[in-house]
């Protein structure tokens, strides 16, 4: 390098104050520090020209004059390997050209380019210098030079630093566009194949659709490819298909390019089952775009006959219809033009008529095609096969073909719906046509089919017999049912054993036997009917209705004793509650038949033996009524008395009322006293209270006032005055009518005593509070809270009273003041009892004061 120029600077740029720095440079020519100090000094204290050079934007003329005389230039020439000096110098030079027009200041830009080239002679491994240079080049319209500079940078720098260059290179490719961008990206993809999506977008923007499809195929065939944009393989594949369909004419296909659109879309149809409708329509659209209408029609036909869902079918069919309508519309417009011009084209008119006919046929086929789709989904769908038969209307040939195809396709164990109905309808089809022999052949085959359930097989046998009945072949119908019910003498087959075929279990089908017995009963003799019923009992498949029907049949034919035996056999088969209904019928029939009283008594005793309490009441009433009519009244009373102990708790009160009524009617009112007494002892409190009122009223009617008063006194223990006011009102009315002052006072004393008793019963207080809260519930939550507070207060008062009673002196007995003993005084230390007029305030004030 020529160092003489660095030692001979322009003297007018050197001021007197610069001599110190110049001498320092002479003493240390190879050191960077003096140069940095000199540059910093010049930037702050240079001459007018220098300040203009180093600190302000200059026009091109001044820069051209001062370029060879600046301190930075001298420094870079003196120390050409200094990265720091070159970076400072290059930043300084590029700064003054920032936002300048590269065309207008072309010469100045070229000087800076040359300066970068000088710097890169020795600093070509510095990526920052290359970045500055390339960024500066991007401001200039020099495409070829810029591209070559990028290539030089990539060759000069190690691979680990290429990312810094490629970041700028991709920006340049976008701006350069065209073939340049494509080739740059092709090179970039060799290093970074993971950015294939960005490359594909560029190819699509540039119109290189064939290359874009190839790239799509590459990344889809690469199992290791991970989308930078988070797209799945399906999304990428869908984008490729959309591009193939939309740009069909601009994409090169065939063996030369390796792009087979038909194979690509068909592979997607096999792979993506939920997108088949869209893909079939896309493939057809591709051929339409290519102008191959016949191929498109073939694709549509294949699509609508292979898809598995109605949604996909609808999508393809609608596209197919739209395609045909567009072609017909074009042909009709052409025909209209020919008609206006007076021209005739028989071939074109024939083509239009043919397409119209094809379109009508397509629309007529739609219901059948939809049915085909549903049957492809599940060929075992009996309901859809029936719909297909209905679609054919009066086309007998196709109906037979459909039935035949359905029977061949359906697996009886997997059938959806009743497979037996299909067989039955098939036979009825021939029956309606008058071909009974063929219908019988179909039924013979049907009863051998291993249906899912015995019930289906039973329905098939019954339908066969009904067909014979419709043809008035009664003997044939009976013969068919006899054949259906054939079984070993002592069958051990379990009807619910699914491991056995329906044919092995059919002889225990109640539906089959029910039809059989009705058939025999209507067309055969009573003896034959009895044999069928007996066989039902032998197989132990009789139902309660069977027992009743058999018994009624025998009764109608005057076989009364046999009818009773049938009831008894039924009772051996069934337990309660079914047995209760059978006993009810049996006993009613026996009573109506007027058989011996002793036998009837035995039957009733047998019925009541082991009878649950909830079913006992009707039987006891029937038994008692029998004794009243044909036996002794005392026997009836004993039966009613037994009933009061045997019936359920819910029925006991009513049973006692009935017993009392019967006793009064037969033996007079006094005979009911022991019954009332036992009822009061046996019934719960709330029912005992009602019974006491009835008992007291009965005694009053007999004039036994003292007995009635005693009963009221006994019942008072069940009645809190605050919750059972009607009871006390009745007693008060009784005393007003039949009592005196002493008895009335005694009633009031008992009332206070009972209330005090309930005040100290914590359990009763709690239940009472709950009852009140339930009564006040409609008033809202505030009323409920008030009831709870009242319950707490009463409970506290009751507990305080118990404590005071425990602290009372032992052995203290109050004097008697009343006519019958009077009221007891409160224990020592306790306040006086409140007046009866305000019973709720008993001991409340004293308790509050004690607290």
UniProtKB/Swiss-Prot annotation:
Chain positions of HAT repeats: 12-44, 63-95, 107-139, 141-175, 291-326, 398-432, 434-470, 487-519, 558-592, 595-629, 667-701, 703-737
Region (Disordered): 771-793, 810-851
Main location: nucleus
Composition-biased stretches (Low complexity): 825-841
Iron as UniProt keyword: no
Localization per Swiss-Prot or TrEMBL: Nucleus
Gene Ontology CC terms: post-mRNA release spliceosomal complex; Prp19 complex; U2-type catalytic step 2 spliceosome
GO biological process annotation, one example: generation of catalytic spliceosome for first transesterification step
UniProt xrefs under InterPro entries: HAT, HAT_Syf1-like_N, HAT_Syf1_central, HAT_Syf1_CNRKL1_C, Syf1-like, TPR-like_helical_dom_sf
Keywords of this entry: mRNA processing, mRNA splicing, Nucleus, Repeat, Spliceosome
Ranges of biased composition (kind: Acidic residues): 842-851
SMART domains in the record: HAT
Function: Involved in pre-mRNA splicing and cell cycle progression.
Subunit structure: Associated with the spliceosome.
Family affiliation: Belongs to the crooked-neck family.
Listed name of the protein: Pre-mRNA-splicing factor syf1
Organism per entry: Emericella nidulans (strain FGSC A4 / ATCC 38163 / CBS 112.46 / NRRL 194 / M139)
Gene name of the record: syf1
């Amino acid at each position: 390098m020529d160092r003489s120029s660095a030692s001979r600077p322009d003297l007018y740029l050197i001021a007197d104050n610069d001599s110190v720095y110049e001498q320092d440079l002479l003493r240390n020519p190879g050191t960077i520090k003096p140069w940095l100090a000199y540059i910093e000094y010049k930037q702050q204290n240079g001459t007018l020209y220098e300040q203009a050079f180093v600190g302000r934007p200059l026009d091109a003329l001044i820069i051209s004059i001062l370029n060879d005389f600046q301190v930075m230039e001298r420094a870079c020439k003196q120390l050409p390997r200094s990265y720091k000096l070159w970076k400072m110098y290059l930043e300084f030079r590029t700064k003054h050209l920032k936002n300048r027009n590269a065309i207008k200041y072309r010469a100045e830009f070229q000087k800076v380019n040359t300066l970068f080239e000088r710097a890169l002679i020795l600093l070509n491994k510095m990526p920052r210098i290359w970045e500055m240079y390339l960024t500066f080049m991007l401001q200039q319209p020099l495409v070829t030079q810029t591209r070559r500079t990028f290539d030089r940078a990539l060759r000069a720098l190690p691979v680990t630093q290429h990312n810094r260059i490629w970041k700028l290179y991709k920006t340049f490719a976008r701006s350069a566009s065209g073939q340049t961008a494509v080739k740059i990206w092709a090179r970039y993809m060799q290093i970074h194949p993971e950015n294939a999506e960005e490359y594909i977008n560029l190819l699509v923007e540039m119109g290189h659709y064939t290359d874009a499809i190839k790239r799509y195929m590459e990344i889809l065939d690469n199992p290791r490819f991970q989308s930078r944009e988070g797209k799945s393989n399906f999304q990428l594949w869908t984008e490729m298909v959309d591009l193939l369909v939309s740009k069909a004419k601009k994409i090169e296909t065939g063996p030369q390019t390796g792009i087979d659109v038909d194979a690509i879309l068909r592979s997607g149809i096999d792979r993506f089952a939920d997108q088949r409708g869209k893909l079939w329509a896309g493939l057809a659209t591709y051929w339409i775009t290519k102008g191959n209408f016949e191929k498109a029609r073939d694709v549509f036909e294949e699509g609508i006959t292979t898809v598995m869902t109605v949604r996909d079918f609808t999508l393809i069919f609608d596209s197919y219809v739209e395609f045909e309508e567009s072609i017909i519309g074009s042909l009709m417009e052409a025909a209209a033009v020919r008609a206006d011009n007076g021209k005739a084209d028989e071939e074109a008119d024939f083509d239009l008529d043919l397409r119209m006919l094809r379109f009508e046929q397509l629309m007529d086929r739609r219901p059948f095609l939809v049915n085909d789709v549903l049957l492809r989904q599940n060929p075992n769908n009996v309901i859809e096969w029936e719909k297909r038969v209905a679609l054919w209307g009066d086309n007998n040939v196709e109906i037979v073909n459909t039935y035949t195809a359905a029977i061949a396709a359906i697996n009886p164990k997997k059938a959806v719906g009743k497979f037996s109905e299909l067989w039955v309808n098939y036979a009825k089809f021939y029956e309606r046509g008058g071909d009974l022999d063929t219908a019988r052949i179909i039924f013979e085959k049907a009863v051998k089919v291993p249906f899912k359930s015995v019930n289906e097989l039973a329905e098939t046998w019954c339908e066969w017999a009904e067909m014979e009945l419709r043809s008035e072949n009664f003997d044939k119908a009976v013969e068919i049912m006899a054949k259906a019910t054939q079984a070993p003498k002592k069958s051990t087959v379990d009807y619910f054993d699914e491991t056995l075929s329906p044919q092995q279990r059919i002889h225990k089908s109640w539906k089959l036997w029910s039809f059989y017995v009705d058939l025999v009963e209507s067309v055969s003799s009573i003896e034959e009917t009895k044999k069928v019923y007996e066989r039902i009992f032998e197989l132990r498949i009789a139902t309660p209705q069977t027992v009743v029907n058999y018994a009624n049949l025998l009764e109608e034919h005057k076989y009364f004793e046999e009818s009773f035996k049938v009831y008894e056999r039924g009772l051996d088969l069934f337990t309660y509650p079914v047995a209760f209904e059978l006993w009810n019928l049996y006993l009613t029939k026996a009573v109506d038949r007027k058989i011996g009283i002793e036998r009837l008594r035995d039957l009733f005793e047998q019925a009541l033996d082991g009878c649950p309490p909830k079913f006992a009441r009707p039987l006891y009433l029937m038994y008692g009524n029998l004794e009243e009519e044909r036996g002794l009244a005392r026997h009836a009373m004993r039966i009613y008395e037994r009933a009061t102990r045997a019936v359920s708790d819910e029925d006991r009160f009513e049973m006692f009322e009935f017993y009392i009524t019967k006793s009064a009617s037969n033996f007079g009112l006094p005979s009911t006293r022991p019954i009332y007494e036992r009822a009061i002892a046996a019934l719960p409190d709330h029912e005992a209270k009602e019974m006491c009122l009835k008992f007291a009223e009965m005694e009053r009617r007999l004039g036994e006032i003292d007995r009635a008063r005693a009963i009221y006194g006994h019942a008072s223990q069940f009645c809190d005055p605050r919750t059972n006011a009607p009871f006390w009102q009745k007693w008060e009315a009784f005393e007003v009518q039949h009592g005196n002052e002493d008895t009335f006072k005694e009633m009031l004393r008992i009332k206070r005593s009972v209330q005090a008793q309930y005040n100290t019963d914590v359990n009763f207080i709690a239940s009472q509070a709950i009852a009140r809260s339930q009564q006040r519930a409609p008033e809202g939550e505030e009323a409920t809270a008030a009831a709870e507070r009242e319950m707490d207060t009463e409970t506290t008062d009751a507990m305080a009273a118990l404590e005071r009673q425990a602290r009372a002196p032992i052995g203290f007995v109050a004097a008697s003041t009343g006519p019958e003993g009077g009221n007891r005084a409160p224990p020592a230390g306790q306040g006086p009892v409140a007046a009866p007029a305000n019973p709720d305030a008993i001991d409340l004030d004293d308790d509050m004061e004690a607290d």
